[in-house]
Amino acid sequence: MYYAIDVSKWQGAVNWASVKAAGIRHAMLRAGYGNSAVDPQFKRNAAQCTALGVDWGCYWYSYAASPAQARQEARCCLQVIQGLKPTMPVAYDIEYEPCILALDNATRTAMVQAFLGEIEAAGYYGILYASKDFIQNKLNWRELTAYDVWCAQYGSACTCPLPYGIWQYSSSNPLGIPGYGTSLDCNRVYKDYPQIIQDAGLNGWIASRPDKPADTEDNSAPDASTKYQLVTIGPVSTGDAMTLMRLCEQLHLTNQGLYRSAWADKPAGTQTLTIGPVSSGDAWRIMRQCLALELTDHGLYRSQYVE
């Protein structure tokens, strides 16, 4: 677990050197809001975080009133972050705006799916930001189990009904970042997002190859050799193997002979899976399932580009 702050124009010109000196090396930055508004501090925040080695992601505050409008917000967000290569997720921030509260749960849920679907289709790691109350009472949350969650719930515990990777636990600066008194959002983060994102080749990064460290950036021009990945998973339980096989069936990989399993030497009764070569999009879908199964947390998901 590590800590992160989230900021927008309301924090003014953040002194990122001071933030880093206080021990904070991860941040979520507001990229913008609504149909096309860019946060006036975003470019500066992203540039300074990158220069100082502070891992950052971003969020887009929604004013959408339909799935189509949420999809357009996602496209605007993608335009704003194009070429910046964040190492933390890209979040859909849905809150209690009147235009959103006027909708029913089904429409709000479809908006989440539309925004995050657009983000993921572009090769970015998407995450839902909402309060625990909003998730539980304003969304059909059981339909959102495929997505990672950044949950806001202030207090000593998070009781979000969905598994979450980030918990916004306070808005009163309990981390004591200089210059913000008792007004700064603070978060506990439970996944190694920079490693996950760079290993999977998301957010504009090139997936790590066996002859390079996982965090090495490949600036070579893309070609046919960088379009497909070989995925190795395991050792995993038979139940997890069956879950992944069903996903591969849905992706039409099994009927092409691209899903292979073998019994592992140990632990007894476990399997090692080899999947591919598959497109980067399919590799991302497989990795997302592995995230849900908590396999990535134990280093059981590995991928590499193949010729």
Predicted features, each with a name:
Residues 56, 125-127, 149, 255-256, ...:
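Hydrophobic anchor at the start of a short beta-strand
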Residues 69-72, 134-144:
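Glycine-rich, charge-decorated loop segments at or immediately adjacent to ligand/cofactor-binding or catalytic sites
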Residues 1-116, 120-125:
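Substrate-binding cleft of extracellular glycoside hydrolase catalytic domains
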Residues 1-11, 17-18, 142-222:
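Functionally critical loop-and-helix segments that line ligand-binding/catalytic clefts
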Residues 119-137:
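Aromatic-lined carbohydrate-recognition surfaces of secreted/lumenal glycan-active proteins
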Residues 108, 122-128, 145-153:
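Extracellular glycoside hydrolase catalytic/binding regions
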Residues 78-92, 96-98, 139-163:
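Structural recognition of alpha->loop->beta junctions
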